[in-house]
Amino acid sequence: MFYHPFLSILCITGSNESALYPFLRYLHTMPHVKLNVKPSLPRDLSPYQVVITTGCALSEQNDVELEQFVTAGGGWLALLHKPNANASDLLGVKIGEPGPVCELRIIFQNNSHPMARRLPDAVYITNPHRPLNKISDDAETILYADWHYQHSPMLVTRRAGKGSIACTTLQAYDNHSLQRILYRCLLHLSGRSDNDRMHGVGILGYAPSVGKLHGLGIGATPGLSLAAICDLSAERRAQAREDFPDARILHTAEALAEDPQVDLIIIATPPNTHARLCLQMMAAGKHVVCEKPLALTRQETDAMCDMADKKQVHLSCHQNRRFDVDYRAIQQALNEGLIGDLFYMETFVGGFKHPCGYWHSHEPISGGTAYDWGGHYIDWIVSLFPDRARTVIGTRHKRIWHDVTNADQERVQIRFAGGQEAEFMHSDIAAFRKPKWYLLGTEGAIIGCWRHELVYELDPVLYYHDKNIPRTELTPDLTLFRRHHSGQIIEQKLALPPRQDFLFHRNLADHLLTGEPLVAPLEQSVRVVAILEAAARSALNGGTVEVLDA
């Protein structure tokens, strides 16, 4: 597996600093971060690259020790969130008077700063307004708040000898954007940042559905550069050359594997080739992102993970639907406890329509009906339930579409270690669609119903043409149901995050270049394959209960 350089951090904090815990938990999600939490500053700081202090009173001796640590090349992040926090003169700031707690618009002073790469132009944080008034000429404002038509510094850095210091009065430690900014600040203080580093990317398989999407996503993501595109088809190579004239166009996987300008390869070929091509590219020392599903069997994913470990390269799955607006809204609602503990879930995709004539409908290539959309839907299920899947039951029907090898309908039932249940159904013989989402929690429910939208184009002769937008690409109507203490069920529309393009590619670059966590970790993509394989085995045996390994 691809290993990031260790980042050794010492955090000095008191026992009553529970507000800081979400940020510390975030740091713990990254294996390369070695975090040590202590109540007071030890005499020996040599094992650490960065020290975090949390507004606790530092003695004059502590100030001296921190100054020696920083001037020798260390980093110091001072979190000045306590009302009575005092700033050491070494920080180069004086803390202004506290203002009201309100939503602040926080902006990077320089949006080309390494800490700002691939982050939004502005983040909104509920925080007391407490400015940092600079008293040192070399103090640099990294973040400021819009305050009464002024730029009010909220995160400031300065050099001290061979090291660096940063301080901030921002304290919304459960805000994911602030967590990412503070982590990047720690990297910056340690002397590491992605700066202008680039990963050359090759696309293996210029599929009509995803080839151009990946090319555009790479081009829109700082830190990634499209270097080459490879496909066996002359027609697809010609299309790739037209779409991306600056990319090298290759016709063999061997040529792509040997290309010295390619660091990362995105494999966008049919599922029955995923394992073989991933192994070939990783054996050549390339990082790999594979289209979903990661593979068809657990034996294949085991071999792929072993190769990634052996060659110390990155391996992950293109789980781009983790960034769909409806999934993100549901995940946010669960994180906020809006329906209590999730214990039951159903998902559905399909309709009553002749299956396509592509490989998606041919089981020896696709893996079967559940492997196609199930690669996304079961990934959602795995990510929303904290416990591991224990048992799987698969059932299928073959009644109408005898010209294709896929089943007409497949259902996958999953039971988790905590007793929770989930179901995924893909049906091409459903004259009436079930809801896309049906979630039950201990305090409420979420229902997501499919939408149907037509787009009209004017025609001077025929008046207009209408086109369907595929239901799978439309955000469903999401409704939250909660039981009021009076016994009534109250319903409301679920809040939706804004739609943003190419978030998968941005997250991939964040992981490769800074070590930030993947939204869809490899181990979860491996679990998806294990569930799909167990469901296929169960369906083949008439719906047997398949027990998954721990």
What are the language-model segments listed below?
Residues 1-30, 194-244:
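N-terminal Rossmann-like dinucleotide-binding module
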Residues 303-320, 341-347:
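Rossmann-fold dehydrogenase core element
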Residues 28-45:
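A short, well-structured beta->alpha microelement
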Residues 198, 320, 443-519, 523, ...:
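C-terminal glycine/acidic-rich active-site capping loop/insertion
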Residues 4-6, 26, 30, 133-194:
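A glycine-centered loop/beta-turn motif at secondary-structure junctions
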Residues 60-63, 214, 244, 248-307:
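Beta-loop-alpha module in the N-terminal Rossmann-like domain of NAD(P)-dependent dehydrogenases
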Residues 209, 321-404, 410, 542:
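Predominantly a Rossmann-like dinucleotide-binding segment in NAD(P)-dependent oxidoreductases
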Residues 57-123, 178:
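A glycine-rich, often tryptophan-bearing local segment used as a flexible ligand/cofactor-contacting loop or short
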